[in-house]
């Protein structure tokens, strides 16, 4: 599992960016006068599979992405780590493909593939020459229809996952900081706050019936979305999809867990000692507004103002002016982007600093930047600049990796909103945001009592992280 928030190199976006996007004039006028449109064909199979097709003939490739609505925080209490375990199991063979043959099939056909586990989904994707689209659809349907869940495969992957936890978290400096650590301190609901890698005891105790039932429950067409982007004819692709996916039976409807978080009324502070760390680190997180609300879009713009780019307020204050750190990182949804999740989320910022820089001084510097946004509405020029930056980031996402960036958005909007056409209306929602709403959103969601602070200190011991301010 790749734990970086952005691991795919963005491609050139000349054909995707409307003329005038980087104009120095009034950005909101520029936005209003340019229509961004992605072709989308959306339908559902009788078994519930959601299908989004988006032809793009700029390159002779096709991206195929299957998203299952089972992520870190949706897994049952006594099955922690199962979502991630299954990411590995899905490459161990299916009815017609042997162990690791899916990987060989893609690579032998000149393609690339991967899978990842995120907060609200597990995904699998391939990018192949367009003439291999049907082969990949057959292969994805084959493992959706029947995974090779065997005792041998299970034991093997239990060991692989356990080793991954040791390599990526336990034996790595700052392992899991802040993406894995912060949700455990900032959230109150178990589903949002448990260790997403899972309790190794749960993983090691998993037996074959457990794993078979997990697959039957979550890896079903009515719990999935399929997105295809690239050089193909939608009518031809639809015939292929119907041929291979339509006869896969649906599973019983899943009772979704309650993911809601209570309003945080008091600042939380947590600290942990990392014996492998060389320098202290600090992260802050604020609970986000509910997804798809006006305040949610306002927070997307506040993220641009505060954190994104060298002209952002936190970079200017903490790096350029005070020299407290070399960089400030973070954003909305550290495991993806502000569009591909479905539940409570954090806006996070983190930094590494020298030991002579005090945590309280960092927090004071952060407050000196945030409080003016809460006490006074920003000017239109600042809002326009944030809109231009956000549009640039959005187009960057749409243009990533030969169609995968677009497929990620389409699959997410299909899976969570039943509306992949949102890709064409998302900009209009940001254009509705006013300076007054920016201020109102900052007042509610960037208040100190909505904040969690996590400090990592170098040390020689590994005590339990201590909490205060709860």
Each predicted region: which residue ranges?
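N- or domain-start disorder-to-order transition segments that initiate the globular core
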Residues: 33-59
């Amino acid at each position: 599992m790749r734990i970086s928030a952005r691991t795919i190199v963005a491609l050139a976006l000349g054909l995707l960016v409307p003329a005038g996007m980087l104009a120095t004039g009034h950005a909101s006028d520029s936005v209003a006068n340019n229509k961004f449109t992605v072709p989308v064909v959306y339908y559902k199979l009788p078994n519930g599979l959601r299908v989004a097709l988006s032809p793009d003939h700029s390159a002779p490739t096709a991206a195929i992405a299957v998203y299952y609505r089972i992520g870190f925080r949706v897994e049952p209490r006594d099955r922690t780590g199962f979502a991630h375990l299954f990411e590995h199991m899905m490459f161990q063979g299916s009815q017609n493909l042997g162990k690791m043959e899916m990987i060989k099939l893609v690579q032998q056909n000149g393609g690339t593939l991967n899978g990842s586990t995120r907060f609200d989904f597990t995904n699998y994707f391939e990018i192949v020459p367009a003439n291999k689209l049907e082969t990949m659809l057959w292969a994805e349907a084959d493992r959706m229809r029947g995974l090779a869940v065997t005792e041998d495969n299970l034991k093997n992957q239990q060991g692989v996952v356990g080793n991954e936890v040791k390599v990526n978290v336990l034996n790595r400096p700052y392992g899991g900081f802040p993406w894995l650590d912060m949700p455990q301190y900032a959230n109150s609901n178990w589903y949002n706050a448990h260790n997403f890698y899972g309790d190794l005891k749960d993983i090691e105790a998993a037996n074959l019936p457990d794993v078979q039932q997990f697959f039957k429950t979550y890896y079903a067409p009515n719990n999935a979305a399929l997105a295809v982007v690239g050089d193909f004819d939608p009518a031809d692709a639809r015939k292929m999809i119907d041929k291979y996916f339509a006869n896969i039976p649906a599973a019983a409807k899943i009772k979704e867990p309650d993911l809601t978080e209570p309003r945080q009324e008091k600042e939380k502070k947590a600290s942990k000692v990392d014996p492998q760390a060389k320098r202290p680190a600090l992260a802050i997180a604020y609970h986000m507004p509910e997804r798809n609300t006006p305040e949610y879009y306002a927070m997307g713009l506040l993220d641009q103002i505060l954190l994104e780019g060298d002209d952002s307020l936190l970079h200017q204050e903490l790096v350029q002016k005070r020299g407290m750190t070399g960089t400030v990182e973070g954003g909305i949804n550290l495991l993806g982007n502000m569009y591909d999740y479905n539940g409570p989320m954090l806006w996070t910022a983190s930094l590494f600093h020298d030991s002579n820089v005090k945590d309280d001084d960092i927090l004071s510097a952060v407050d000196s930047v945030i409080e003016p946004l809460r006490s006074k509405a920003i000017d239109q020029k600042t809002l326009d600049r944030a809109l231009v930056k956000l549009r640039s980031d959005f187009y960057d996402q749409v243009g990533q990796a030969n169609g995968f960036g677009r497929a990620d958005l389409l699959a997410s909007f299909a899976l969570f909103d039943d509306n992949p056409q949102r890709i064409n209306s998302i900009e209009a929602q940001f254009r509705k945001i006013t300076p007054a709403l920016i201020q109102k959103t900052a007042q509610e969601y960037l208040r100190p009592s909505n904040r969690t602070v996590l400090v990592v200190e170098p040390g020689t011991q590994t005590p339990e992280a201590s909490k205060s301010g709860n």
